[in-house]
Amino acid sequence: MPIQILAARLANQIAAGEVVERPASVVKELIENSLDAGATKIEIDIEKGGAKCIRVKDNGAGVCQEQLTLALSRHATSKISHLDDLEAIVSLGFRGEALASVSSVSRLTFTSKPADQEQAWQAIAEGRDMQVTIQPAAHPQGTTVEVLDLFFNTPARRRFLKTEKTEFQHIDELIRRIALSRFEITFVLKHNHKIVHQYRATQTQSQQEKRLASICSESFVSSALYFQNSDNALKISGWVSDKLSARSSNDVQYCYINGRVIRDKLINHAIKQVYAYSLPQGKFPAYVIYIECDPDQVDVNVHPSKHEVRFHQARWVHDFIVSTLTVTLNESPLSASEPQSQPKPSEHAYLPANRGEEKTDSQYEPKEKNKSAGRVNEQTAAPSSGYAKRETNPQLDQAKMAAYCDFVAEAHLPFSADEQQSSTLSDLTFATVVCLIDRQYLLIKLNAKQQLLNIDSPFLVLSLENVDLMIKQMELFAAWSDGEVIAQPLLLPVRVELDALLLKTSEDFNELFMRLGFVFKIQGSKLIISKVPALLRQAPVAKIIPELLTFLSQTDNNMDAQQVNLFCVFLVNTLKQQQAENINWTEQSAKALFDLLLSLFSEKLSDWQKQLFRVPDLSLLVQGFSHE
């Protein structure tokens, strides 16, 4: 058969196979056109599940008489005009295929009136010959598109339609998804001339929650955690369910990018990673997530349905979602989400948000740890090493801490320890946090019974950076000592080229790495790392691994606890050196870190005084008033 150009009718019907899958596909395309036209009210009237009639009416900008015929032509659109426009698409539609594809498999009537046009006009097209007839009509400002007898000229496609009830359920779900993305727009859905749903435009937060409840259920709204976060040009907000609100189906999972309904594998993977070990088998999280980014950072021209997107910085987006949702779930006390069957600990302690549940048996196989959840009202940006309130076994923590302090007392710590007067620090449980200094230090006021011996000052300055490093060392050592591994999978495995000596070292110390949360394999001359400890999740793993192996190559294979502790010190110090900048602590995270320090270290604080605390010289402040 010779090569030939397809007839317009045949080409449009082929395109319709991609664009028009079922009646819900038609409704989606028509509503997106209405939204792009600036409509504030959209009415959707369905008959017989959409097989008989689909009518979408809006009060948008409308189409002038001269462009009605062009509007039904293939590859005709007002939304893009140049190739560069594809790099920054802001409209929902842009292909110019929808109306032509729909009219090729139905009897379509397009009626429209712009505000500056006195008369409304109507375009009529049928799938048989694709000829468009223009005639005057009566219509208010806006557009009405009526699609009759869908697939009337393609019997095979019509036979594949499901029952009327099933097809309408798909349309109903579509309207729900779109209504959650545009709270400022009124949607009215009718089926067989009866109003099924009416979502009125919302102006206040309470009205938004009312629409959210009508779509996602009252139970979701009552237990959902609201969050919002931003990182440069990337913003994320929405609602997520806590652990107790897990559902038996994934029917409440909505995600939007720049107002577009999407089902993206990258985002699904990020959300699953957050909830992976927080939910029981067969349970699903519920969420409504809104992501906003620069249009040139996301490619929506991936699939005709436009449900799939491609991010230019996929790793950044993935990790931003994971960190934001993890902090959200960890912001509230675990008591709001612990199963009732579990015994309640007698005391509260603070643990890093990345810590997992305590284990009594020793297991070397790394696995991701549980995430705590609870009710929060708002989330702000927090350091990557944020801390959250947790309930733990205080006896177990004290036992770990005592053993850890005994080993670390003789270790060569990476902290500066300027010579100053020797003194002893008593219990700081009732000390008062005064303020945060330069987002790096915490000013603490002691009461009369908590003074430093031989030092006449009621104030201390705490180095948050040093406390953070010290606690990370404790976390690593605890993971090694009792098999409580904190491992997180990398989005993409990291490949590191190593020489023969370092490859041999990685084999010799494989058990140590596993107990600390590393998972890797050797492939030729490369080490392929798939999981790392939680504290290395955002670190440059490819730079850190060779340094760790170089350190281990100079030690004995049979490492005792003292040597393992020194390795943990070296690992944390290396991590600090590889960080581009210091953490900017917030008052909330700094206070949580201080409380964590007290709960874990208790009477051992005097052993760490030179590394953690400094006594401010108040005489310098006094001299400032003397004008000398």
UniProtKB/Swiss-Prot annotation:
Belongs to the DNA mismatch repair MutL/HexB family. Residues 333-390 are annotated as: Disordered. One of its GO terms (cellular component) is mismatch repair complex. Residues 333-344 have a biased composition (Polar residues). NCBIfam families: mutl, PRK00095.1-1. This protein is involved in the repair of mismatches in DNA. It is required for dam-dependent methyl-directed DNA mismatch repair. May act as a 'molecular matchmaker', a protein that promotes the formation of a stable complex between two or more DNA-binding proteins in an ATP-dependent manner without itself being part of a final effector complex. Pfam families: DNA_mis_repair (PF01119), HATPase_c_3 (PF13589), MutL_C (PF08676). GO terms for biological process: mismatch repair. PANTHER family: DNA MISMATCH REPAIR PROTEIN MLH, PMS, MUTL (PTHR10073), DNA MISMATCH REPAIR PROTEIN MLH1 (PTHR10073:SF12). InterPro entries: DNA_mismatch_repair_CS, DNA_mismatch_repair_MutL, DNA_mismatch_S5_2-like, HATPase_C_sf, MutL/Mlh/PMS, MutL/Mlh/Pms-like, MutL_C, MutL_C_dimsub. Keywords: DNA damage, DNA repair. GO terms for molecular function: ATP binding; ATP hydrolysis activity; ATP-dependent DNA damage sensor activity; mismatched DNA binding. It comes from the Bacteria. SUPFAM superfamilies: ATPase domain of HSP90 chaperone/DNA topoisomerase II/histidine kinase, DNA mismatch repair protein MutL, Ribosomal protein S5 domain 2-like. This is DNA mismatch repair protein MutL. Residues 355-371 have a biased composition (Basic and acidic residues).
